[in-house]
């Protein structure tokens, strides 16, 4: 209803101003600004819905000021361009309509009415209401009743007898199991669900709506609210260090806790969270690649579900035979948005909906088959009688190709339990949420029936039942939950450990690189993650007087304040204010100690603008002084005009990437020398090794042969035509996720370049 009212007010404002208000520059600008705000808010809501499937939620506040990178980002480029073009077109059309009668005399009354209607349209819009509520949640002091509802359980289970297998299905919400809405989509896993305790109304709350947040909520009984964006949790050294979570209790009770997934454990700090709370045995893409049957059988995120669940079964067998009490947690990935992935071993590879194939539904049907196969192996084993199997979604599905169909249904998270010791078949329609999952499992295992804000759905009362406005209540508790991190409020001295790549201050430890905004009573960490912008882009969003400490590779800050370090990949510390003074210090000891030294200086806005503009220069446009192309730093030498076909810098250098261009092409500002030696330090990837690699300058071509290890080769060129471009053509680029950023499409690697140098020859 509010959408219709908001749009009606918007339309009325446009029509009244266009036909009655007349000519006045101030009223035109004011009305266009407010109407433009209405458009921006609603496009933001549309874009947020596209990415999150949940409107402008808590995570979007962070994303509004940072780049969205990571999972399948290329899939979102076209919609993003469409939004920008649409926004420009709407603004242009809006301005044209409002100025239709600009030659008529100004009418104050109609101008005022149009402006008031425009303001009303903004106030009534759902986007404005959502943003207002989120901003309020950032500034609240907390809710006094938090302590009454947050309950710490006993640290042990008195007489543990059951092993636990806990399966997180990526985005595998219960809605998919509605056979009337989606016929024969989940027959195998749906049949198993119907054999156990099926909790049919598991609500998703703020702070539980992405993978690491869903894991924290289900194991600790609290939403993931932090002094930083949740998916950047990989930079912290401990995770809710004071809280008692399910893994802690199980470890204290004699369990060995295992976690197996196909993606990199570092993503979003899963490794930090699990190690902080009782898990000593973790297996992700790096740990599994040496043990899986086919280490090259991977999707954009890591190993496919069939591979991961096969490894989980092997681990279940091994642990069961040992007689050791254990828990085995696993997380699938094939159903990750926007499209999902199809394992090669499943029978259900294709699912049609609305008369055409749907990739997301196909991925769901395949993944549920793999999960069901894993569960049936456990059920058929002699150890099932001592095992509790839990299957849950980590969160509701985000915007995938099935999302518009899911939204037509009553959406809930998946949570069901199959007990080998005491088979129970029942559908429980009690109102609950993700935070109740851990407490319910703890209750089944013989422990307490509460865990944080979670309550057992078998013997307790969920917060979702106690509070009708549970979403608003959860946001009201946000400051209380953030305080559980015991995060420092000041930063005066700090220590950098180069061996561990960590910074420590005021009792807290963070992984490097790191950017910190430091104020009188708050230290705000801004880590670099797969979902955040590079730190220099985040720093560019700081206000002129904001105090910052930035710890990163020297070359990243050298172009601003320390050109002598432009080629250094060591750690450096920069601190100061963008509109004031900045200093850069080279970290030259294994254990390096520093102090903050912020000066209250006069702000220079010209300096501020120059710093911001320089920080926002994209990597390929950065230039440095050097007599060769050094590939392990961003940018290129000043003599290079442009280059293509080259991937991002890594610690050793850069790969060629045929996804960015079939050839490595380096164009210089001036013609290359008439006679020169080309000194190439490089290696080959895969089948490109020991094969002739054409290297061209103008009409002359030489052959380069590389091995899998780095070597230096000198090629001799004559350049009578004054060519200015160097071209290298890898013979057989290989599609691979090796060394790739998690969630990005595979790169096509050919040669790995460390350094290229042009040396003019005499004569």
Swiss-Prot record:
It is a multi-pass membrane protein. GO terms for biological process: glucan biosynthetic process. GO terms for molecular function: phosphatidylglycerol-membrane-oligosaccharide glycerophosphotransferase activity. GO terms for cellular component: plasma membrane. It catalyses: a phosphatidylglycerol + a membrane-derived-oligosaccharide D-glucose = a 1,2-diacyl-sn-glycerol + a membrane-derived-oligosaccharide 6-(glycerophospho)-D-glucose. SUPFAM superfamilies: Alkaline phosphatase-like. It is found in: Cell inner membrane. It comes from the Bacteria. The chain crosses the membrane at residues 1-21, 26-46, 77-97, 108-128. It is an enzyme of class 2 (transferase). Belongs to the OpgB family. Transfers a phosphoglycerol residue from phosphatidylglycerol to the membrane-bound nascent glucan backbones. This is Phosphoglycerol transferase I. It comes from Escherichia coli (strain UTI89 / UPEC).
